Amino acid sequence: MADTFEFEIVTPDKLVVKDVAEQMQIPGKNGYLGILPGHAPLITELSIGEISYTLRGETKYLALAWGFAEVLPDKVTILAEAAERPEEIDVARAQEAKKRAEQRLQTSGPELDYQRALNAVKRAEVRLQVASHATSKAAVGH
């Protein structure tokens, strides 16, 4: 069995990443899924969350808004509504989006789409978490 698998993450706008990994964590609808080479074939819906993948001891991260994953023994394809690398995330904008979404949750009435506001908060939190990986790498000189 191979030690790695290929993967790609695609949005409607672009190919976000095409790489090789030894392992990957993806945010499934019912929790995170761990992917290793030789994984059983699977198609699954993905939720808002952090994607991580590791190659030669280095772990990289991406923020995922929503999507689907096709997992094959030697390849993973993720079709995402939106996906961002840490260096692409505008931290100030993500903080402001989180603040606005939290304020929406404080309102009440028929105009409040509660689930949409919760998703906006979660997405902003994930973006900030992924962005923090870039900050911590810069601090240690990577």
Curated annotation (Swiss-Prot):
- Molecular-function GO term, any one: proton-transporting ATP synthase activity, rotational mechanism
Asked if the record carries the keyword Protein transport, the reply is no
Q: How does it sit in the membrane?
A: Peripheral membrane protein
Report the locations given in the UniProt record: Cell inner membrane
Name the UniProt key words of this record, in alphabetical order.
ATP synthesis, Cell inner membrane, Cell membrane, CF(1), Hydrogen ion transport, Ion transport, Membrane, Transport
Record-level GO cellular component terms = plasma membrane; proton-transporting ATP synthase complex
Q: Which InterPro entries match?
A: ATP_F1_dsu/esu_C_sf, ATP_synth_F1_dsu/esu, ATP_synth_F1_dsu/esu_N, ATP_synth_F1_esu_C, ATPsynth_dsu/esu_N
Q: What is its main location?
A: membrane
Query: What family classification does the UniProt entry report for this protein?
Result: Belongs to the ATPase epsilon chain family.
Record function comment: Produces ATP from ADP in the presence of a proton gradient across the membrane.
Q: Which HAMAP family match?
A: ATP_synth_epsil_bac
Q: How does it assemble?
A: F-type ATPases have 2 components, CF(1) - the catalytic core - and CF(0) - the membrane proton channel. CF(1) has five subunits: alpha(3), beta(3), gamma(1), delta(1), epsilon(1). CF(0) has three main subunits: a, b and c.
UniProt name for this protein: ATP synthase epsilon chain
Which organism is this protein's natural source? Koribacter versatilis (strain Ellin345)
Lineage at the top is: Bacteria, Pseudomonadati, Acidobacteriota, Terriglobia, Terriglobales
